[in-house]
């Protein structure tokens, strides 16, 4: 077009981001606006560094693990017909994030076709009831206070327990009535967790 010599046509340089992995790291990488300013994810938190520094930025995420976890989430999203799901995998020895996946995700190369719900990072911005995840904190507090040890035994645990105005029951009737603290955590025992919580 420029070879036509039409003076009304002027070239304009514009930087464009290209994301070869498409959806795979979308919520980690985040987004930019029309002027290439970071507005979410690493694009936002490392905005200045990305603009000034031409060197590569090394992340701790593993591409293969990220792929496998994403595939599993997509599969079970379809099986359970859920609105979305999320997973995070961290190395507990050093805090490095090995994988962070939020479904639905998006292809940052095709931002014009993305709905708002796809932009939500369910790992960092999702709001959830604690549910059984909180059992970890209950047991950790009891260990910290030297109230229990992993092998502390809890016998004759009921299948239902009245807690204030609420009745708490086991999600699985097959959970034994005699469990160690370790087994309560492994089997996600509701009654045993309440008993430990009451001892704090």
Predicted region positions:
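Short, flexible micro-motifs
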Residues: 33, 41-44, 102, 134, ...
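Generic domain-boundary/flexible-linker signal
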Residues: 39, 98, 106-108, 195
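Short coil/turn connectors at secondary-structure junctions
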Residues: 7, 24, 96, 149-150
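Active-site loop and adjoining helix of the penicillin-binding protein/serine DD-peptidase-beta-lactamase fold
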Residues: 53-93, 108-200
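Short beta->alpha transition motifs characteristic of CBS
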Residues: 30-35, 99-105
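Short, solvent-exposed loop/turn and secondary-structure capping segments
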Residues: 22, 98-102, 110, 151
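Small/polar-residue-rich segments within soluble enzyme cores
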Residues: 1-55, 59
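Basic, glycine-enriched DNA-binding surface that flanks or lies within the catalytic cores of DNA
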Residues: 14, 90, 98-101
